[in-house]
Regions:
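Generic C-terminus detector
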Residues: 234-254
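Short, surface-exposed loop or secondary-structure junction motifs
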Residues: 1-203
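Short, hydrophobic/aromatic-rich segments at coil-to-beta transitions
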Residues: 203-209
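Short, small/polar residue-rich loop motifs at catalytic or cofactor-binding pockets
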Residues: 213-215
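Short acidic, gly/pro-rich beta-turn/loop elements at beta-sheet edges
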Residues: 173, 201, 231, 240-241
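Short, well-ordered beta-strand elements
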Residues: 219-220, 225-235
Length: 254
């Protein structure tokens, strides 16, 4: 991925990125094992091929508009651009070997070539969205209830259950991504999901799920306690355990 600049080249549209990715060999045969990868970008490309509609338009129609997520998308408007927060850390994910932590120094980090701010062609399945804490919170609440904040049912309870269920066999546990362990967690269609409290390192609940972003954004949903949480930062490769600290603080108040 790094040598071919699959992630780093934001000038490619989704079709071009998948074409470049398709030139690389598979890490293993399908069903042999599980690997955190760019599979969701491949899925976005397949969705475009099947529907004949771009993934950004589908997200807008089925998620962003119904949830009133007015500040979420791949391309910022001229009105939104001045509100974009500065990114800090290291320029490329390749430079931080995705989950190897770097010295926590506030250096401004120009990521525009990787995440174009105003390119109408840029779109991905797994990275690259701009959003606000308000919008991200609306999305987290939707994953908790299946409804918009106005009460509109957007997804069936059966589908919610299918999305939340752990998909990893015991042979793929404990969950580890690029050398970083996630004790107690499996993986569902929405990110990591707590399956074994006895192995967990944070005071959470069975079925709690969520995931993080490259610049340390983070969300979690706890169906048991009916709560959600969102953290928004702009630091690539932070070495501070912010996610764990916030989970500990949140659950300490319950």
């Amino acid at each position: 991925y790094r040598e071919a600049e699959i992630l780093a080249d934001g000038a490619r549209d989704l079709n071009e990125m998948i074409s470049a990715l398709a030139q690389l060999p598979l890490a293993f045969h399908p069903k042999e094992r599980w690997l955190y990868s760019m599979s969701i970008d491949v899925l976005a490309h397949l969705v475009e091929c099947v529907t004949g509609t771009r993934i950004d338009a589908l997200l807008q129609e089925y998620i962003f508009d119904p949830l009133d997520m007015r500040d979420t998308g791949f391309c910022l408007s001229n009105a939104q651009l001045p509100r974009l927060m500065t990114n800090y850390g290291r320029y490329k994910l390749e430079a931080i070997a995705p989950l190897n932590k770097i010295e926590h120094v506030l250096e401004e980090n120009n990521v525009a070539s990787m995440y174009p701010e105003q390119s109408s062609e840029y779109r991905r399945g797994g990275i690259g969205l701009y959003a606000t804490a308000q919008d991200y919170s609306a999305f987290a609440r939707f994953l908790l209830t299946g409804k918009s904040d106005t009460g509109e049912k957007l997804i069936s309870n059966n589908m919610i259950g299918l999305m939340r269920a752990n998909r990893l066999p015991l042979s793929a546990l404990p969950l580890s991504i690029s050398g970083q362990a996630f004790p107690g967690y499996g993986w569902n269609l929405l990110g990591r999901v707590m399956t074994d409290l006895g192995q967990g390192a944070v005071p959470t609940a069975l079925g709690e799920f969520g995931w993080s972003g490259a610049a340390q954004s983070y969300f979690w949903v706890d169906p048991q306690r009916q709560i959600t949480g969102v953290i928004m930062t702009q630091f690539m490769g932070s070495n501070h355990p912010l996610h764990e600290d916030m989970l500990n603080a949140a659950y300490a108040t319950l």
